[in-house]
């Protein structure tokens, strides 16, 4: 895994940081555990109601709108969780706190630093967790961030800037950008990380105004 090449534009420091992000694409407040075991998952009382395709319009202050097609057939629990949080207004006013040009932009943390989430965690819908999910982490994919534990994803998500298929099978992709990829490009190009993990200073974090779901 350490020998994979992730893109010609990557600087050496970013390359190293990406390896770290493989284990820390979230950093939830719960204690991280060694991957490989399935953990107890806090789930909604209601059953999954999103079985097909829905759309999410992610409006980002000063940048514009990113429209994402969510695949409820490939990752039903993940899509249901994202839709519920969006419709509840959970994401309104939150930010993208970690941005790595050529890799991804990550947001959806109420703490704004990679340590927070919602009041629930969900099942990791990916092959390493025993669940088939054929969506690949190509440019424009949206996927769930998580801690080391497979079932630790909560509210944090990331949008892939450039192909990052080394994530396939270990993270739950659940859709793709259909419009507004130039917004992702602009955000990634404007970002000025404070470290090799892509951390963005709080005052410089792009703000999610709202996420609107269209079914």
Predicted features along the sequence, with ranges:
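Cyclophilin-like peptidyl-prolyl cis-trans isomerases
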Residues: 23-215
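N-terminal secretory signal peptides that target proteins for export/translocation
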Residues: 1-10
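Secretory targeting signatures
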Residues: 10-28
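Generic short amphipathic/hydrophobic targeting helices enriched at N-termini
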Residues: 6, 16-17, 37
């Amino acid at each position: 895994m350490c020998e994979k090449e992730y893109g010609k534009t990557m600087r050496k420091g970013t390359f190293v940081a990406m390896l770290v992000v493989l284990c820390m694409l979230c950093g939830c407040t719960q204690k991280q555990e060694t991957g490989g075991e399935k953990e107890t998952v806090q789930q909604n009382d209601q059953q999954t109601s999103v079985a097909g395709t829905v759309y999410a319009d992610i409006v980002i202050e000063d940048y514009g709108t990113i429209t994402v097609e969510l695949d409820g057939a490939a990752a039903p629990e993940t899509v249901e969780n994202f839709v519920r949080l969006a419709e509840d207004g959970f994401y309104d006013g939150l930010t993208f706190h970690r941005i790595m040009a050529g890799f991804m932009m990550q947001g959806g943390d109420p703490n704004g630093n990679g340590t927070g989430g919602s009041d629930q965690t969900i099942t990791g819908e990916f092959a390493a967790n025993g669940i088939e999910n054929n969506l690949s982490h190509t440019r424009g994919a949206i996927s769930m961030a998580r801690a080391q534990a497979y079932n630790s994803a909560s509210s944090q998500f990331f949008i892939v800037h450039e192909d990052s298929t080394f994530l396939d099978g270990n993270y739950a992709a659940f859709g793709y950008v259909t419009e507004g990829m130039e917004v992702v490009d602009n955000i990634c190009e404007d970002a000025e990380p404070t470290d090799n993990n892509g951390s963005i200073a709080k005052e410089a974090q792009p703000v999610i105004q709202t996420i609107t779901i269209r079914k």
